[in-house]
C-alpha cells in the first residue's frame, strides 16, 4: 500500500504543469481579489475596525479551502487514468483489497491537498504581510494547520466518492 501511495505521489509531482493547474482555481481567486474586489470590499465594509486585515484573513481562509478542493480533485485524476487504462485491474491482482487500493489513492490525495494548501497559505500570507502589513499570530498557525489537514481529508473523501461514482457509472455505460 505504501508503494502505491509513493507511486501516486511521484506521478502527481512529475507533471509540473498539472501541479500548477491544480492550484489554478485558488490562484485565479487570489488575483481577482487583489485586482478587483479588495478595494471595493474595503470601501463597503469601512464601518468595521481593521477592515483590511479582516478581509485579507477571510480571503486567505476561503482561497486555501478552494485550493484543498481543487487539488484533491486533480490528484484523483490518477484514479480515473488507472481505471481507464486497466491499471486498476492489475492492482487488484496484488494482495491489496479494493478498500486498500482506494485508501492508498485517498492517502496520497490528502497529502497532496495538504501540501498545496500550505503552499497557497504561505504565498498569500507573505503577500498580505508585505503589501497590507497584516499580522498573523503564531498561535493561530497550529490550529490553522489542523483545519488545513481536516479540510484536505474532507475534500479528498468527498472527491473520491464523486470520482468513484463517475468512474463506475462510465464503466457500466461503456461496457
Q: Which residues does each predicted region cover?
A:
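A short amphipathic helical element positioned immediately N-terminal to and/or at the very start
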Residues: 1-13
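Alpha-helical transmembrane segments and their short interhelical loops
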Residues: 98, 104-175
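Hydrophobic alpha-helical transmembrane segments of multi-pass membrane transport proteins
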Residues: 28, 55-128
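Alpha-helical transmembrane segments and their helix-entry boundary regions
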Residues: 18-19, 78, 101, 171-173
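Helix-capping/transition residues at the boundaries of transmembrane alpha-helices
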Residues: 11, 91-93, 163-167
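Perimembrane helix-loop junctions in membrane proteins
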Residues: 41-42, 78-85, 132, 164, ...
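Hydrophobic alpha-helical transmembrane segments of multi-pass membrane transport/permease proteins
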Residues: 11-42, 55-72, 113-117, 174-175
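Short helix-coil transition/hinge motifs at the ends and kinks of transmembrane helices
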Residues: 39-53, 129-139
Amino acid at each position: 500500500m505504501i508503494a502505491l501511495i509513493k507511486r501516486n505521489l511521484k506521478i502527481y509531482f512529475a507533471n509540473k504543469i498539472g501541479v500548477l493547474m491544480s492550484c489554478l482555481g485558488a490562484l485565479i481567486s487570489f488575483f481577482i481579489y487583489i485586482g478587483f474586489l479588495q478595494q471595493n470590499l474595503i470601501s463597503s465594509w469601512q464601518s468595521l475596525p481593521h477592515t483590511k486585515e479582516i478581509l485579507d484573513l477571510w480571503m486567505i481562509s476561503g482561497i486555501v479551502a478552494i485550493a484543498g478542493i481543487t487539488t484533491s480533485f486533480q490528484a484523483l485524476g490518477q484514479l480515473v487514468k488507472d481505471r481507464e487504462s486497466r491499471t486498476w485491474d492489475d492492482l487488484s491482482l496484488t494482495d491489496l483489497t479494493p478498500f486498500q487500493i482506494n485508501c492508498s489513492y485517498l492517502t496520497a490525495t490528502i497529502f497532496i491537498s495538504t501540501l498545496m494548501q500550505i503552499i497557497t497559505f504561505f504565498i498569500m500570507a507573505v503577500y498580505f504581510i508585505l503589501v497590507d502589513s497584516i499580522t498573523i499570530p503564531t498561535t493561530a498557525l497550529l490550529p490553522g494547520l489542523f483545519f488545513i489537514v481536516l479540510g484536505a481529508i474532507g475534500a479528498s473523501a468527498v472527491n473520491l466518492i464523486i470520482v468513484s461514482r463517475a468512474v463506475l457509472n462510465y464503466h457500466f455505460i461503456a461496457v
